[in-house]
């Protein structure tokens, strides 16, 4: 796949914050990803759906919401492991940020 300026413009459309204009009406460019990574619409929608319909702890209870959340969490971990070619999905650990991951 050849990456062109059109490719980047298509990707930018997925990130609502990157539609903003800043100083001198220029497109916002965000490079501080070690601190906070901007979210595409797909992530915002998934998070919103989770909080509205499935919000619960994982691996902590046997009620419906906890079971749904645990299943979704483990499916996501499996997908990430497959994408990264990791044999055991338990090696995939989600952390809140770079500092927590390093520590």
Predicted regions mapped to residue ranges:
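Pyridoxal 5′-phosphate
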Residues: 1-103
């Amino acid at each position: 796949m050849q990456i062109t300026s059109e490719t980047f413009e298509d990707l930018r459309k997925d990130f609502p914050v990157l539609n903003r204009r800043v100083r001198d009406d220029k497109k916002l460019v965000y490079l501080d990803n070690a601190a906070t990574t901007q979210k595409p619409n797909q992530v915002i929608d998934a998070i919103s759906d989770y909080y509205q319909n499935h919000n619960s702890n994982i691996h902590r209870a046997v009620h419906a919401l906890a079971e749904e959340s645990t299943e979704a969490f483990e499916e996501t971990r499996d997908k990430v492991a497959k994408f990264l070619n990791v044999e055991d999905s338990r090696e995939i650990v989600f952390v809140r940020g770079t500092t927590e991951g390093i520590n």
